[in-house]
Amino acid sequence: MIQIKNAKELDGMRKANALSAAALKYGGEHIEAGMTTWELDKLIYDFIVKHGGTPNFKGLYGFPGTACISLNDTVIHGIPSHDIIIRPGDIVSIDTGAKIDGFNGDNACTYAVGKVDLEAQRLLDVTKAALYKGIEQAVAGNRIGDIGYAVQSYCEDAGFSVVREFVGHGTGRELHEDPEVPNYGHQGRGPRLVPGMTIAIEPMICQYDCKISQSKDGWTVKTKDGGLAAHFEHSNAILKDHTEIMTRFWDDPDFDPEKFSLK
């Protein structure tokens, strides 16, 4: 069932997503070649806890980390590890969130470590742009399929492919709520968007074929062909006259997570 939030609940969602976005940007700014993904995860954990939140990924369905940290051909759900070292030229996806006062935030961004090749950079640019194409369609009166169509058509026109097995979702008191928000679809199909809905839109896009495989750890999802993958995500509130990007801080060049405060 789709949960419609009232004004007080929307304020709670804004707070949780502000912290989530600040933590994501903090993590992104501290990525360094030579560090392990476990070290990066610990930085994000400490940031969330310092600001009064709870890392909402940690322990969810048994996931061991504060963030899913996915490198190169890992699409999503990379487990932070002492054994995975970030290297120059990698692309690193961070997907993380915080819970505070009973509400959940969720967001993701894929970062380039130093200089990456032109095709890797194009994948990042297209996937990020596709996120905003989807958000443009996430307005009251439109349907879920309008979002998916916008993401899919933009990415496929650029020569990339869209993961089918994992999708965006509603957010709220639970991290994952109805409705599902696929990154593919048909215009005018699916549930209608109404004010008070809060949804996470998160394109997961592959450089080549969209076929994926899950590792033996039960979490890590990789491209089958070894091509790169990128993942970007914003949590959004559908309002009467516009849509609010609640996790906008991670993509604000003027936002300094070191100065972040919920007070």
Segments (PLM) and residue ranges:
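Active-site neighborhoods and metal-handling regions in enzymes and metal-associated proteins
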Residues: 1-263
